Amino acid sequence: MFYKIAQSIMFQMDPERAHNLAIGSLKRTANTPMTAFYAQCIAPKPVTCMGIIFPNPVGLAAGLDKDGEAIDAFHAMGFGHVEVGTVTPRPQPGNDLPRLFRLKPAKGIINRMGFNNKGVDNLVANLKAKKTDILVGVNIGKNKDTPVEEGKNDYLICMDKVYPHAAYIAVNISSPNTPGLRTLQYGDLLDDLLSSLKAKQTELAEQHGKYVPIALKIAPDLTDEEIASIATSLIKNQFDAAIATNTTLSRDGVSGLANANETGGLSGKPLTELSTKVIKKLAAELKGEIPIIGVGGINSSQDALAKFDAGATLVQIYSGFIYQGPKLIKDIVASYSAK
């Protein structure tokens, strides 16, 4: 009830202003009696993925809390994990405004944010400051002004800094809003990046005395051959998980709607079937050797179950969470527990 009232107010506002207001409010109310407005008790349904025991299979996808400012508030809502980021070595403003658009009739969102964030050092400070024990994955990327061929160094810098504080690390090479980034998903560039990250993980595990898994986040706009090639590279380089998928450049199902022609990645309900299809294909290629975290267009518990059936071990929500509120977490966990 409270969420529906808050949503009706937020949906009258500019999307990015509403987003910033929401994160600010959650940051201020976390670990105070005010959490009563959004906290909920969810019966545990533990799931093991990447060698980690998650309290339930529903996580918050990267992009909502880029700088890790409201982690404890999302814990109160019952998320099994939170993925913060995408974070880059240096702070950057992202793309010009406006850059976030609602497609309300389709329950979709288009964004061209461009990895706006306050930098990895700021994120690390926020990770150190969190008061709950929620599992936090950190999604890392490259700065816009770093040439693609030197992008690997940005990932290694971020990995080095977040490693002691992360439950797992997600490598984002699939955002459509950083020029050239998606080229890292192919061929020798991908193999070189993954092998370098794996070597860095081995070095950091020894240095810190703990193993932090690494996952690769991929795009939905891939051919079957490209998915097969990525799967081969993930297995070869002994990655710990794949996250499928990021936003799509496709506009299937939204043509003619207001904002549909805006540049950027489309998320939400229009992405549901495409991301599930990619998960199914990826699962067939990985053959159970590497787990998949399913994300993209989960707007109901049925959508989440379809992701699990396609081969996902965990799921994450973002756009569906904006449209449905915290109740979606509870619904998915209940349906998962009953299956």
From Swiss-Prot:
Binding site for FMN: 62-66, 86, 139, 172, 217, 245, 268, 297, 318-319
Keyword field: Cell membrane, Flavoprotein, FMN, Membrane, Oxidoreductase, Pyrimidine biosynthesis
Membrane topology: Peripheral membrane protein
Pathway in which this enzyme or protein is active: Pyrimidine metabolism; UMP biosynthesis via de novo pathway; orotate from (S)-dihydroorotate (quinone route): step 1/1
Gene3D superfamilies (UniProt xref): Aldolase class I
PROSITE patterns tied to this protein: DHODEHASE_1 (PS00911), DHODEHASE_2 (PS00912)
Active site (UniProt): 175 (nucleophile)
Chain's role: Catalyzes the conversion of dihydroorotate to orotate with quinone as electron acceptor.
HAMAP family: DHO_dh_type2 (MF_00225)
This protein's name: Dihydroorotate dehydrogenase (quinone)
Source organism of the structure: Shewanella amazonensis (strain ATCC BAA-1098 / SB2B)
